[in-house]
Swiss-Prot record:
NCBIfam families membership: gcp_kae1, T6A_TsaD_YgjD
Residues binding substrate: L133, V134, S135, G136, G137, D166, G179, N276
Domain of life, per lineage: Bacteria
Single Gene Ontology MF annotation: iron ion binding
Protein species of origin: Teredinibacter turnerae (strain ATCC 39867 / T7901)
Keyword Ligase: no
One GO term of the biological process aspect: tRNA threonylcarbamoyladenosine modification
Entry annotated with the keyword Metal-binding: yes
Cellular component, GO annotation: cytoplasm
Annotated binding of Fe cation, by residue: H110, H114, D304
Enzyme class: transferase
Protein name: tRNA N6-adenosine threonylcarbamoyltransferase
Family matches, as PANTHER family: TRNA N6-ADENOSINE THREONYLCARBAMOYLTRANSFERASE (PTHR11735), TRNA N6-ADENOSINE THREONYLCARBAMOYLTRANSFERASE, MITOCHONDRIAL (PTHR11735:SF6)
EC numbers, comma separated: 2.3.1.234
Amino acid sequence: MRVLGIESSCDETGVAVFDSQLGLLGHELYSQVAVHAEYGGVVPELASRDHIRKLIPLVDDILSSTHSVGAIDAVAYTAGPGLIGALLVGSCVGRAMAYAWGVPAIGVHHMEGHLLAPLLEAEPPEFPFVALLVSGGHTQLVDVKAIGDYMLLGESLDDAAGEAFDKAAKMMDLDYPGGPQVARFAEKGQPGRFKFPRPMTDRPGLDFSFSGLKTFTLNTVNEHAQANGLPDDQTCADICHAFQEAVVDTLVIKCRRALQQTGRKTLIIAGGVSANNRLREKLEQALAKIGARVYYARHEFCTDNGAMIAFAGCQRLIAGQTADLSVDVFPRWPLESLDAIQTSHASNPRTTLDNL
């Protein structure tokens, strides 16, 4: 089965073609960072309009480059969660193409796409495992027994980790998008100059909270400004270092705790924040001490992309799940509400990815 995947949940327009026998044939991604940079964040109306402008040309390009014109067996598109206008663009285009081609279509859960992205790698993890989904909109720990068989272990009670990164960047007037900027500044930071708390790590449970850390960061910036004027680059770097260490340590502590509570020996991390090199480094160190292993997707598949949607959609379509022609999208959609499918249906994604 050859599946066209469409991702349009927020500010990236992604398309890909995945073949159940040959693997990932190709993917293309258009980022709207330049569109939203002057506003310091995503403007939903602008995001929707830009998806309309870019999606069909991207589909044309990917069908041509993968020699898939007339060869698509199904269309998978992101149905949620996300920005409703952006979701509707991808849903309408995906369903229209499926109808015109006479092939099935299916709406894919955006976070299931992220969760399964590490399976696109040459050495994918085996079920069962614990997943840390960490992005601008989500911070969740999930016990994964099979595709679709998910149990929520813990989640953020307020801000997501990625959102906290972005807000911290704004406080220091760093460029948009903020998360990567904080990570870059943190590399030059002096350890120990500022000490930040590790929220909710001193109590049992697997939930997160980052709103207090965000407030702590704001107070640190303001206190320094009152005493010494606006922070210079080195002070910003020192604050970024302390902030990033606090977030990373919190995530690592909870991940290790989740593995110990479930008895799992495998962790996957997915979502935009999973690209953070410091998080990867500290997770590998911590898990090695307990005989566990961490997997993640390559950096290009950590952010939103069409490849993860094509792959996730392919698994569900092979299992016989399709959608009707009604255009349903879900800005809010609990991951654990998805139906499980048999892992024996899962196709091998490895064959062509490393040749892209």
